[in-house]
């Protein structure tokens, strides 16, 4: 009997997962019992290739495993043993499953061809954008159908064609009579849904090649046939057996779409996967722009009289992704050709609301020609709306979101949540189309000198806008509380007095930076505010001018001399941040809620430190009213509300407001005191105290930097904040090392005052990152990953702010920090570094979406609370 050990060196093109190997690990050599094969023994052996090599040879060779202690006889039945089988229902035959779990389903059935163009044009829903633009869209054609489409374009007079397949899912073309017909792998749970969100690094093209090899093997094991499904509505006569003699009976997408280039030299094919929902990634925009760069006839560099190539886009049905791609193509040709031929606006467009979404209006307000940029996108959407109007779909989704009740469910999930997700995805897609048109305005005349992703890093404020799509909290009033939809929760319930200052100062966690007029505290009541002000103005401290800054983003009420905040009854710990455009907007909303609670005179459900009670409030004040009451006794008191996000770096404009408030106070009195508070007096308060310390040092004098102590503890390097990404920023900045050390000095001086809290803005970064490995579940792990990155970014922003204080000191900081960041720091590449933020010493940042600005900043305004109010 012959033996082979070399088979163990072969590398399979597709390795079956271990759970699909039907073995019990007994190690028996009984060749009749397939279940006796040890899964472990074959982990590193190419069963796929081995089995294939012996199909025509019934001699059973022996394979010696790597440790040379066990041997097994492998018959040709082994291949079958390592493929999974399944069936749609008990009445249907069992057969092999693609990739161990998928059924091959006919890609497009006749009902999807709404425009009825398959027979006349070769593809379902084939159409041209209106306005004379050379932009076409279609659903998935067969091989012969695609040839017919190309003939159609030639007959329309197009000498050049650039074709984009915008599908991310694998598509295989199986031979059927004289044509090759598209099939896609689908899950049994949802045979109507294609695969999407493929694993990181897994390309559809590679998956198609792997599936083709599998299908060929399946057919060899089943008499040169394989079962596929054509009718997944009624399953009449299903499944169908399709003949496969060789791999040439199966085409992959590239073979169908790329081969015409040999017959039509002016034809080009590109695969540009676009998402089913939401906006494309920056890398996908980059890929599209790179294709445009490669086609001179699409650029202004070319003779304007020379017609541009036809742009043809295709997905499965020719609707969602194709529609998105057609709009992108139309915008490009608008910049190439100018305004379109005069068209009548469709009836549907006229019935859409005239009022813009707030995030779109905010964009218009920030861009000089913003109105025109948005109008051009609206026009492009209208010109491509024959099959699908993304604006109409957006407003329809919004209407359903606001109109549906709480209790409804879709597939076990909240219907309201389903429509909220749909509205956010649609608005994000619309927003990114507008952003892309803004990019075209700047970069098209320059032949795309900057890629889209690099350009976005020069416009970081766009990411700030995109992070605030859902502004529904701005539409709410106190009615939610008086109706019992939300409840009032005592602030102290989730704000422990770790520093034990409540007894002496009537407020939790009150502290001072050593030798500096900078104080921090938890949220005070009217009485506690009086205690702190009395303490600061007593004979020992003698402060006559005090700036008090409240850093909270949520609604705060003092009712019956206790501090309460509105919360969801099912999630009492979650603060409800209000995405206000200004402090005044938040304070106005706060006053509305307070007035509603007071005038309702209802018994309201409130949560105290331990128990739940019903209370009727005789008083209900806002923070502004509390400080107004103290102003007569303390005429030098100035109160400011500067809401900054919890856990994160303050936004650029937050630094502006903090610095401006301090500058104004110091202009009045150079020895004024500064008090900061958030909810518990920890995260945001400490951040603001660091900003205040750095600012005062620049107004007065910066202490000498002491030499670093030699510390021999685990992670000492990272405890000192010497992460690779931090050092990249340090290297970019003039005197970067000195600037970082000054920030560290400020952080260390403040942490001395809060030792019992075990909270240090720099040291918490590595502490939180280390906790990711011990997370109890995936939800906790994702939260810890986010927090560690947010803490890292916060530390970097403090370093950048100190650099700004140094570099702009000569002009007394006339240029705001936000302007400096956008005009100076962005050109130096700071936002490009922040767009790859991660712990590169431990992991690959590119594999983590949260390392990118788009996703990380989006999380600042994301919560898992039920949708309330209107989507404005």
UniProtKB/Swiss-Prot annotation:
Transmembrane feature ranges: none
Region (Disordered): 1-37
Residues where lipid is bound covalently (N-myristoyl glycine): 2
Protein name stated in the entry: Paladin
Family named by the database record: Belongs to the paladin family.
Gene: pald1
Family annotation (Gene3D superfamilies): Protein tyrosine phosphatase superfamily (3.90.190.10)
Coiled coil feature spans: 186-210
């Amino acid at each position: 009997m012959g033996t082979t050990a070399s088979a163990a060196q072969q590398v399979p093109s597709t390795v079956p997962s271990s759970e699909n190997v039907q073995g019990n690990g007994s190690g028996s050599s009984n060749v009749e019992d397939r279940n006796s094969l040890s899964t472990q023994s074959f982990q590193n052996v190419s069963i796929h290739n081995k089995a294939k090599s012996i199909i025509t040879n019934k001699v059973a060779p022996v394979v010696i495993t790597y440790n040379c202690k066990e041997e097994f006889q492998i018959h040709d039945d082994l291949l079958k043993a390592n493929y999974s089988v399944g069936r749609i229902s008990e009445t249907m035959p069992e057969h092999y499953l693609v990739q161990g779990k998928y059924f091959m389903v006919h890609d497009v059935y006749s009902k999807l061809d709404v425009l009825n163009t398959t027979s006349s044009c070769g593809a379902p829903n084939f159409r041209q954008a209106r306005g004379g633009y050379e932009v076409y869209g279609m659903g998935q054609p067969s091989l012969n159908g695609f040839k017919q489409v190309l003939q159609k374009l030639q007959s329309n007079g197009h000498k050049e064609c650039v074709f984009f397949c915008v599908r991310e899912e694998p598509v295989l073309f199986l031979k059927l009579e004289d044509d090759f017909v598209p099939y896609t792998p689908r899950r049994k749970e949802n045979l109507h849904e294609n695969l999407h969100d493929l694993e990181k690094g897994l390309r559809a093209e590679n998956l198609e090649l792997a599936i083709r090899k599998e299908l060929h093997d399946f057919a060899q094991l089943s008499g040169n046939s394989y079962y596929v499904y054509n009718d997944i509505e009624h399953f009449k006569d299903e499944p169908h057996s399709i003949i496969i003699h060789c791999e040439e009976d199966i085409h992959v997408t590239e073979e169908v779409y790329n081969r015409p280039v040999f017959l039509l030299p002016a034809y080009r094919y590109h695969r540009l996967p676009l998402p089913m929902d939401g906006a494309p990634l920056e890398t996908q925009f980059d890929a599209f722009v790179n294709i445009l760069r490669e086609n001179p006839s699409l650029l202004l560099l070319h003779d304007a009289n020379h017609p541009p190539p036809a742009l043809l886009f295709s997905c499965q049905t020719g609707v969602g992704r194709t529609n998105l791609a057609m709009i992108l193509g139309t915008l490009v040709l608008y910049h190439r050709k100018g305004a379109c031929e005069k068209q009548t606006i469709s009836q549907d467009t006229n019935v859409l609301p005239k009022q813009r979404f707030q995030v779109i209006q905010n964009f218009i307000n920030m861009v000089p020609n913003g109105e025109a940029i948005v109008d051009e996108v609206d026009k492009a959407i209208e010109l491509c709306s024959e099959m699908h109007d993304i604006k109409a779909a957006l407003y329809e989704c919004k209407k359903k979101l606001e109109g549906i009740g709480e209790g409804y469910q879709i597939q076990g999930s909240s219907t309201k949540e389903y429509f909220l997700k749909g509205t956010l995805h649609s608005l994000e897609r619309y927003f990114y189309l507008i952003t892309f048109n803004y990019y075209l305005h700047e970069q098209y005349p320059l032949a795309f000198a900057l890629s889209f992703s690099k350009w976005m890093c020069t416009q970081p404020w766009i990411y700030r806008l995109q992070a605030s799509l859902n502004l529904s909290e701005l539409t709410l009033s106190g009615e939610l509380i008086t109706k019992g939809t939300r409840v009032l929760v005592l602030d102290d319930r989730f704000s422990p007095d770790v520093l034990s200052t409540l007894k002496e100062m009537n407020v939790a966690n009150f502290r001072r930076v050593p030798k500096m007029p900078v104080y921090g505290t938890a949220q005070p009541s009217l009485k506690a505010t009086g205690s702190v002000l009395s303490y600061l103005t007593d004979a020992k401290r003698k402060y006559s001018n005090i700036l008090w800054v409240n850093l909270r983003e949520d609604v705060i009420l003092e009712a019956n001399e206790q501090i309460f905040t509105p919360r969801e009854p099912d999630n009492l710990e979650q603060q409800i941040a209000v995405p206000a455009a200004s402090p005044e907007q938040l304070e106005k909303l706060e006053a509305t809620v307070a007035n509603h609670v007071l005038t309702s005179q209802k018994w309201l459900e409130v949560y105290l430190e331990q128990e739940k009670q019903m209370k009727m409030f005789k008083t209900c004040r806002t923070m502004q009213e509390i400080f107004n009451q103290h102003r007569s006794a303390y005429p030098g008191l100035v109160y400011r509300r500067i809401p900054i996000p919890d856990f994160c770096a303050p936004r650029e404009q937050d630094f502006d407001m903090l610095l401006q408030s301090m500058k104004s106070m110091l202009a009045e009195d150079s020895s004024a005191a500064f008090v900061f508070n958030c909810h518990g007096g920890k995260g945001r308060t400490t951040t603001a105290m660091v900003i205040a310390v750095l600012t005062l040092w620049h107004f007065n004098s910066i202490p000498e930097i002491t030499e670093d102590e030699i510390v021999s503890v685990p992670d000492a390097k990272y405890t000192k904040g010497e992460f690779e990404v931090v050092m990249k920023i340090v290297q970019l900045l003039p005197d970067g090392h000195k600037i970082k050390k000054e920030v560290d000095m400020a952080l260390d001086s403040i942490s001395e005052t809060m030792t019992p809290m075990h909270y240090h803005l720099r040291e918490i970064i590595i502490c939180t990152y280390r906790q990711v490995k011990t997370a109890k579940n995936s939800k906790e792990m994702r939260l810890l990953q986010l927090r560690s990155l947010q803490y890292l970014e916060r530390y970097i922003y403090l370093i950048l702010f100190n650099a700004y204080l140094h570099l702009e000191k000569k002009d007394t900081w006339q240029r705001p920090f936000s302007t400096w960041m956008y005009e100076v720091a962005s050109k130096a590449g700071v936002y490009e570094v922040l767009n790859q933020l991660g712990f590169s010493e431990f992991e690959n940042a590119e594999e983590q979406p949260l390392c990118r600005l788009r996703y990380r900043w989006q999380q600042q305004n994301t919560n898992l609370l039920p949708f309330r109010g209107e989507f404005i």
